[in-house]
Amino acid sequence: VSFPILSEEGREIPYEDRKHWEYFWLVDPLDGTKEFVKKNGEFTVNIALIYKDTPVLGVVYAPALDVCYWAKQGESAFKDGQKLPLKTVDQRNTYKIVASRSHMSNETQAFIDAIDTDKEKELISIGSSLKICLVAEGEADIYPRLGPTMEWDTGAAHAVVSESGRNLMKYKDGKYSKHEYNKEELLNQWFVV
């Protein structure tokens, strides 16, 4: 069985063709281009298998760091063979917020400023889909992304974070809803992990 591939680096496939796909591969061969150029190691290769509108399999590999996250729907999520999450919120004295190193928006900053917590807030800036994976492994509590991303930027890590017991949700006007894939417009809406 072979499935079609939707990729940042591939040809543009019209929605009229894509809307009939039951399964497809969603691939970003280089997520975190700015981090790659900066040579800081915070870039990833993202591969997801999408069923209708939901990631059911995901692999996020950071080659410079030699770190691999993966998940399969119903079978948990892992980081280098260790089941996620590795830590729980109760094991920390701070509320860790992860944000983009290269793409912080005013809206994201306002969201972070409005977070109400009894713990001291700690901001972690990192590139690529590693932000989502930090929430999956329990190294961060929340990742708000109120700025532009594409479906291939999130699909693989979305599978990982979902199987870790957390979730990636669409965020609009203070309300959360399911984040879907293979939409007519491949630009993601704002989301919070």
Name these PLM-found stretches:
Residues V1-Y51:
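Flexible, acidic active-site loops/lids enriched in D/E/S/T/G that coordinate Mg2+ and/or position polar
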Residues E22-F24, V56, Y95, D141:
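Conserved acidic residues
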Residues E8, S100, I126, Y171-D173:
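Conserved beta-strand termini and adjacent loop/short-helix elements that scaffold enzyme active sites
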Residues I47-C133, K183-V193:
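Acidic beta-strand-loop-alpha-helix segment within the catalytic core
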Residues A110-T117, K131-V193:
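Oxyanion/phosphate-interacting regions
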Residues P4, K121-E122, N167:
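Conserved beta-strand segments of alpha/beta enzyme cores
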